[in-house]
Every structure is written in C-alpha cells, then in structure tokens.
C-alpha cells in the first residue's frame, strides 16, 4: 500500500507535469505513441483540461494497476515524464492481454469526443456524463465510460486497450473520476492534478481495498502473476500433487471442520497462520518433505502454502474450537459426535500448535499433564503456551510431577499443544476417558493417548477406559517415576512419556488402519497416535530433528485414514511448529509422506528398523540409558502395558490385559528404539519408503486380493508369517492386533509406523507380528494364558531380545521376533524386490520347515547375543543378520505354506527355547549355515540369491555409511 501510494504520488506529479515536454519525451521514447501524442497535443489545445483530467483518471487507474502489480516502468522518470507514458505502458501491458477491438471501438467514440472536445465545456460535460454513467454502474458503464474517458483523454489511451483496466479501475474510481471532472472542468491541469491527487488519495486506498476483487482482471498481468509466482503457487502445485489423493479426504475433513468452528477460531487461525506460515516456510524450504513434497517441502510454495494455511487454519480453528470447547469442557458429546472431525482437527492442531498454544492452554487443561510431559523435551518451543498450560496443568496435573516438568514444558508449547490435541482426541473419544484424565491427572495423560488409539472405536474407547483404569495404577507409578525423574531429567521423563505415546501412537495408527476400515475409528486413534507421535518427535531435542519425521510418518498413515493430506499437514506443521528447530525433520517427513504416506508407515518399519539399528546402537543407548533405563524400565512396562492394552483395546479388550503386561517388558527396548528410529529414519525412510511404499502398497493390495495368510507368507516369507498365522489359528486374531501393538512396542517403537501400515491391511499385520513375534508371544505371556506356552519361551526370548533391542534393537526390532531378524529393513527391501520374483517363493516357503527352525534359533540366538554384545558388535551383527535374514525369508516362505499355524507356533516356542539356550553357540555357525542353507536350499534361482546379497549389501551400506 505504501509503495502504491508513493507510486500514486509520483503518478500525480507526472500528471501535473503532463506537459508537451512529457509528450515530447514520449515521442522520443515511444514512436508508436507519437501519433497519439500528436493527437494529445491537438486535444490538449482544444481541451487541455479534459485531457489532463482524463489522463489523471487514467493515471489513477494506472496507479491502481501499478499497485496491483509492476506495470513495467523502466524508471520513475518515465512515470514522471507523462501520465500518457504510464497510461500507454499500462495499457500496452493490458493490450498484450486484451484484444485491441476495444480500442477500435473506442476510437470512433474518441473521434466524436474530439469533435465535442473542441469546446472544453462540451468535452467536460460529455466526460462528466460518461463518468457519472460509469461511476454508478461501473460494470455496464465501464466500457462507455472508458470510451468517454478516451475521448477526453489524449490519443494515448486510444492507442492502448486500456478499457479492461479502466473497467475495474473505473469501478473503483468511478465516483472519484466524476469528482475529478467536476473539479477540473472549470480549472486547468493544475487544478485537475490537485483534484486528481485528492481523488487519488481517496481512491488509491479504495482501489487497494477493491483491488483484491476487482484487480483480478487488471492484476492478471502483474499482481496476480506475482502472487501465483510466489511460493504459494509452487506449494499449491506440489501440494496438489501430494494432496491429489489428500484433497478429497482433506476437503471432507475441512468440510467436517465446520465453518462455524473456523469462524470461531479465525483469530486463533490468524495467530496460527503466521506461525503456520513460518512453519510452512520451513516446509516450503523442505519442498515438502520434498518428497511429500517436503514435509512441508512438498507443500506447494504459495498456493499450496495458502491452501495449506487455509486448510490448516480451518483445521486448527476446528481443533482449537474443538479443544477449547471440548478439552476444557471436555465435551464428550461434541468430540464423540465429531470424532473424525475432532481428530483430524487434532492433527491440524498439531500443525498449528505453535500458533494454537494460546488456544492450547485453555484446551490442555486436562491435557496439561500430557503437555507438560511432552513439552519438556520440546522445551525451546513455546514458553508462552506452557505458561498457560502450567496454569491449566496445575489443576489438571494434580500430580505435581508434571508441574515440575512444566518449566521445561514451557519451552515446548507446540508439543504441549500436540498433547492437548492428543488429549482432545482422547476426550473426543469419550468423556469417560476425560474423566480418567481428570481423576488421574497425570497418569491418564499417557492413557489418554493410549486411549486415543483405542478410542477410535467406541468399544475400544470403553476398553481404553478400562485401560486407563488398569493403567491408572501403572500410570500413577509412571507419575511417581516421572516426577522423581522429571526434576533433574524432566525432559527425559517427558521423552519417555513421548516414547510411550509414540508407542501408543504407533499402536494407535496400527489400530487406526484396521479401524480405517471402520472409517471413523481410525480417525480417532489417529489423533491420539499422532499426538503420541508428535510427542515422540519431542522426546529428545536431538531426536526431535529425526524423531518428528518418524512421528510425522506415523501420523501420516493415521492422518491418511483420518484426513489424508490435511492431517499430514498438521503433522508437518506440528513437527515444524513443535520443533521449529526441526525444519529438516519436518521436511523429511513430508518427503516421506509425499512419496507415500501410508507406505511411509509401511516402509517406516523398514527405515525405522534401519534407523533403529543405526541410532539405537549409537544414540538410543546413551539417551535412553538415561531416561530409558529409569523411565523406560519404570514407565516402559507400565506405559507399554497401557499402550499395548490401548492398541489392543480397540482390537481386543482381553488382549489389552494380555498385551499390557507383555508389552511392558518389550516397552523399554521399544521405547529406546522408537527415538532412534525417529532420529535416523529420514534417510533410511526415504530410501526404504520409495521401494517399501510401492512394495508395501502392492503387498497390501495383494493381501486384499489374495488370502490373508498367503499374502502374509508372501509379505513376510519367514516364520514370522507362521507365528502370525499360528496366533490367528489359536483364535487370537484380535489378540494378534492387540499383541501386535504390544509387540511393536516391545520390538521397538521404531516400528510404530509398521503397525500403522500393517494393521490396516491384513498382510501388514502379519508383517508386524512376524517381526515382533518373539515380543508378541511375550505380551500374550503377560496377558491371558491363551498363549502361555508360547508366551513363556518367547517372553524369555523377548527379554533378552529386548535387551538386545536396547543395545542393538535393529536385530531384535527388525527381526521377526522369535527369529530376531535384525534386517527387517533389508528384508522389506528384499521383499519388495522379491515380491515380483518371490510371488513364486510361496511354493518354496512350503519346503524347508526345518531350515526355518534352524534359521530361527540361529537368528534368535543372534538377537540375545546382540543384546549382550556391545553396540559395535550389534552393528557387525547387523551386517551378518542382514546377510542371514535372506535365509529366513526363503526358509520361512517355504515353511509358510507347509507349516500349520499351530505347528509354526509350537516350532516357534521350541525355537524360542532353543534360541535362548543356543543363542551364544548358534550365533555365527548358524549364521553362516543359515546363509548357505538359505541361499542354497531355498530352491531360489542363483539370480535370486544374488538379488538377496545385493539387497543385503545395499541395506547394510547405509548403516556402514552412517
């Protein structure tokens, strides 16, 4: 506006200096306008006043055009040289876009005007009449008014097809021009210029205000183009690409987000929009995850950013309104009524969270505990939000431990908002949960997230309610542990909470994909899981940069189920906003999401396992050794139990009880892996995601087309499939879901995306189970006695495996579980490669059951030993395990069809026992033997063996490089 006003002043000065000198300059500079200038001189002699007045009106219009966008003046001198120059150039630009037919039509009118102009009075009268006509009815009178103006104006306007700009400008300037003419008619150019200045002063702002709407025609040349050229347009393009699939879900979610809520929170949206814009800027820098087109990178620069901001603002407004209306009040009716909306909104809230913190503090009231727990890791983010949250948390966090964490949490308002969002979803899940939240101010915080995943289904919500009640005891313990740990390592304590939440979130996503079939249920679990995941990124600040992508990836599949692109954006913005220092992780997330959001969850396990292998050995041990041993050990069992129960809850309430204890054991290891996986998943994620996303998407489709077990065999091609199937024959199919979440937790929350991706499609579930089979049996061990025989041996295995997972989670977490395959990443990659070729192997899978047993003991032995081995050895074992893993897939494939599910379970149990006893001895011998047997006896062609070796080498390469 200021620049446009300055231009207006300059134009006015030019209008004042509209002398013959300016016309002479025009002649020298613009030969094309010489004729028009000559006509101008002639017209000026008969009616200099009229021409000047019309020129001024043109200048006004031109000024408006200039304001709308750069008209292309080479210098201010040209502007000052003459309004004619300005008009000519502005019209010249318009002429480029506007046919000259209008000019021709106006010329005859101009001729009449010239004749009439012979008398200045007549000319002015005609002009005034035209202006009056144009002013009141600008659209209809615009053309005639333009003609009248052209008649009044010098031939410059005649030459240029200025009618279109005048149309819109006249609409804006119509009354002003009339005033100008009235003032100018008696006076000369100086008076007209003065009047023009006055009218410009009044009109320039008017034109500016009207420009957004009216400038569309005029601004198409300049301002509109610039706007389109700005980042938003690129963001829109990339976003359109990413959101092509999201658009529908987002539009639905945005539609679900009532405009009323958006209106109610327009102010918060305004607040959010600035922060979202920075976050979107970061995202834009990321080019949306570049891939996604960047976490935010994929987000189209301007258009996409604007659309995204608008969507995010809508979603954030909805989330803010939902949280404000729902969380503080915890209106179960509103949230349950709009669980999908509320949770998609909650996801957006995560996005908006930096701006939404003002909203969040009222919302977090019940969420304060969670937010405080989550916030400490994100400490640097938002002290302001945490202040409000502290106020809110004080009542909510009856348990003071989180208040202690609150100071740290003060730095992490974004994450606090995520917590609020997650709690809002949980509150949305039902007032019952919110009641446990309040009753157990801090303990329910984790349960809330846990509840959030189970909450997707109303029944799971009830189960989750029971879970919070169950976990109430454990969570109070958590609280006790957290408070004690929170004062000194309060960020680690929230980290552990975040870890647990990511586990719950991953489980929630895992549950949400299956629930995705149920449509609304996945939406609800998604937000909780998203929040948990969002909290997960917060766990360690160091991890944040890496963790947010993992959380975002986890959230991406869930959000796909919920909102699709909208929630993904929320995750992006949440990651960016929660950790504005995490623009990179946010970027990587969108990249992964862009590649394939659900596939990201699918591939997420792969790259997470790889990242877990790398990070767990390197980072997770020290970091988790601090918060992990204390809080993971304390909270790990409890939180994992609650989480396992909550993910299982949506699927199977009995298994919630079973999974809760089982998961508790694996939870510490799982918790440690999760951050590491979140940390390094980006490069690995991107690599594995492109392949694994396609591969897993195809696998899920195949599973849909093919029987679940056959698809599982193909997907896993390892005994893990058999254990999965074994669990299913035991009649624990729902338990499998529940145990999967626990096993995923025990395995390492590095795989939470896997549960998410694996749960929606049946085959994916087997994959998760197969990878986590040793841990999964253990959750059953702690839980119901259905699988006690399996559970007992596998529990023993799980514990050493968990230890190994803590030290070298890649083998344990990546391993099918009992097999302890450390190479799920390469296995997934090789599976992707093999799937095309190994769709044949299902026959081979039937062949060597004994080999599978051998490979399982050997690999299981590997896992315990790895747990014992130092991190370096774990890394070395990784390469070996990756080399060995092909054996299991081949053997498992062969066995998959032959072995019955029960037989497979029995073998798995026996193998687990054998593995425990033989792990040390079998390690290297069986590794080599299994390698040989798997390559030689898999009945696979040599090219398959080579492919395996190559895939293993490639999978090992990133680790070695790292």
UniProtKB/Swiss-Prot annotation:
Residues 224-244 have a biased composition (Basic residues). The keyword Ligase does not apply. Residues 266-278, 429-440, 459-480, 536-546, 555-570, 631-642, 709-728, 784-806, 844-869 have a biased composition (Basic and acidic residues). Keywords: Phosphoprotein. Pfam families: DUF4592 (PF15262). The keyword Translocase does not apply. Residues 407-425, 503-521 have a biased composition (Low complexity). Residues 38-102, 131-174, 212-871 are annotated as: Disordered. This is CRACD-like protein. The lineage of its organism: Eukaryota, Metazoa, Chordata, Craniata, Vertebrata. The gene is CRACDL.
């Amino acid at each position: 506006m200021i620049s446009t006003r300055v231009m207006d002043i300059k134009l006015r000065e030019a209008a004042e200096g509209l002398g013959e000198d300016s016309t002479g300059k025009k002649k020298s500079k613009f030969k094309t306008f010489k004729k028009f200038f000559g006509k101008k001189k002639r017209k000026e002699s008969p009616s200099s006043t009229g021409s000047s007045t019309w020129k001024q009106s043109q200048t006004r219009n031109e000024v408006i055009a200039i304001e709308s966008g750069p008209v292309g003046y080479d210098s201010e001198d040209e502007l000052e040289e003459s309004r004619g120059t300005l008009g000519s150039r502005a019209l010249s630009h318009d002429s480029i876009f506007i046919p000259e037919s209008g000019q021709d039509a106006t010329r005859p009118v101009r001729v009449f005007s010239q004749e009439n102009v012979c008398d200045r009075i007549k000319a002015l009268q005609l002009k005034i009449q035209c202006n009056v006509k144009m002013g009141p009815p600008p659209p209809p009178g615009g053309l005639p008014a333009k003609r009248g103006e052209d008649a009044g104006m010098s031939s410059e306007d005649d030459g240029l097809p200025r009618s279109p700009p005048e149309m819109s400008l006249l609409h804006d300037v119509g009354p002003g021009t009339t005033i100008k003419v009235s003032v100018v008619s008696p006076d000369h150019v100086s008076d007209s210029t003065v009047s023009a200045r006055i009218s410009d002063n009044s009109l320039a702002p008017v034109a500016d205000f009207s420009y957004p709407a009216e400038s569309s025609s005029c601004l198409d040349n300049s301002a509109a183009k610039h706007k389109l050229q700005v980042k938003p347009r690129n963001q829109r393009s990339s976003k359109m690409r990413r959101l092509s699939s999201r658009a529908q879900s987002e539009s639905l979610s945005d539609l679900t987000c009532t405009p009323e809520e958006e209106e109610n929170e327009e102010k918060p949206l305004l607040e959010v929009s600035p922060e979202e814009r920075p976050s979107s800027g970061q995202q834009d820098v990321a080019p949306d995850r570049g891939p996604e087109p960047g976490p935010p990178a994929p987000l189209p620069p301007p258009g996409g950013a604007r659309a995204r901001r608008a969507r995010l603002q809508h979603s954030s407004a909805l989330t803010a309104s939902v949280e404000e209306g729902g969380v503080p009040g915890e209106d179960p009716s509103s949230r349950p009524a709009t669980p999908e909306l509320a949770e998609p909104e909650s996801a957006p809230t995560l996005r908006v969270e930096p701006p939404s913190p003002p909203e969040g503090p009222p919302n977090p009231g019940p969420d304060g505990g969670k937010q405080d727990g989550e916030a400490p890791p994100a400490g640097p983010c938002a002290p302001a939000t945490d202040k409000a949250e502290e106020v809110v948390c004080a009542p909510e966090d009856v348990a003071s431990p989180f208040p202690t964490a609150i100071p740290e949490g003060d730095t992490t308002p974004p994450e606090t908002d995520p917590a609020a969002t997650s709690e809002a979803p949980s509150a949305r899940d039902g007032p019952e949960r919110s009641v446990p939240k309040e009753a157990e101010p801090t303990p329910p915080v984790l349960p809330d997230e846990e509840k959030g995943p189970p909450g997707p289904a109303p029944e799971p919500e009830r189960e989750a309610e029971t879970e919070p009640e169950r976990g109430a005891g454990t969570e109070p313990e958590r609280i006790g542990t957290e408070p004690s740990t929170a004062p000194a390592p309060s960020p680690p304590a929230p980290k552990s909470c975040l870890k647990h939440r990511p586990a719950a979130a991953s489980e929630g996503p895992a549950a949400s994909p299956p629930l995705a079939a149920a449509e609304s249920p996945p939406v609800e679990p998604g937000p909780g899981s998203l929040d948990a995941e969002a909290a997960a990124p917060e766990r360690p600040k160091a991890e944040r940069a890496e963790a947010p992508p993992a959380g975002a990836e986890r959230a991406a599949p869930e959000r796909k189920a919920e909102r699709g692109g909208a929630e993904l954006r929320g995750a992006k913005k949440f990651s960016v906003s929660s950790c504005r220092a995490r623009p990179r992780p946010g970027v990587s997330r969108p990249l992964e999401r862009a590649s394939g959001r659900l596939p990201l969850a699918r591939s997420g396990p792969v790259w997470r396992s790889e990242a877990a292998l790398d990070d767990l050995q390197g980072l997770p041990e020290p970091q988790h050794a601090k918060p992990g041993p204390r809080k993971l050990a304390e909270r790990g069992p409890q939180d994992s139990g609650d989480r396992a129960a909550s993910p299982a809850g949506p699927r199977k309430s009995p298994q919630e009880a079973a999974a809760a204890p089982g998961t508790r054991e694996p939870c510490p290891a799982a918790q440690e892996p999760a951050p590491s996986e979140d940390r390094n998943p980006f490069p690995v994620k991107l690599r594995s995601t492109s392949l694994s996303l396609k591969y897993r998407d195809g696998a899920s489709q195949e599973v849909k087309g093919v029987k679940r077990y056959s698809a599982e065999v193909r997907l896993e091609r390892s005994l893990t499939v058999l254990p999965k199937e074994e669990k299913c024959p035991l009649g624990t199919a729902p338990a499998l879901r529940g145990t999967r979440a626990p096993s995923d937790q025990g395995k390492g929350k590095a795989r939470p995306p896997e549960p998410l991706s694996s749960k929606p499609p049946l085959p994916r579930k087997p994959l998760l189970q197969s990878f986590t089979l040793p841990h999964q049996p253990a959750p059953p061990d702690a839980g119901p006695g259905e699988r006690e025989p399996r559970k007992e041996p596998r529990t023993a295995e799980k514990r050493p495996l968990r230890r190994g997972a803590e030290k070298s989670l890649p083998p344990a977490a990546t391993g099918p579980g009992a097999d302890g395959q450390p190479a799920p990443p390469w296995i997934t990659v090789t599976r992707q490669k093999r799937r095309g070729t190994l769709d044949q192997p299902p026959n081979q899978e039937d062949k060597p059951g004994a080999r599978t047993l051998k490979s399982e003991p050997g690999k299981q032995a590997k896992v315990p030993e790895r747990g014992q081995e130092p991190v370096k050895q774990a890394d070395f074992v990784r390469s070996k395990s990756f080399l060995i893993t092909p054996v299991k897939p081949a053997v498992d494939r062969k066995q998959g069809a032959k072995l019955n599910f029960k037989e497979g379970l029995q073998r798995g149990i026996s193998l687990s026992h054998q593995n425990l006893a033989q792990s040390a001895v079998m390690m290297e011998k069986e590794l080599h033997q299994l390698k040989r047997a798997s390559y030689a006896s898999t009945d696979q062609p040599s090219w398959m063996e080579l492919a395996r070796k190559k895939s293993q080498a490639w999978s090992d390469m990133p680790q070695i490089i790292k």
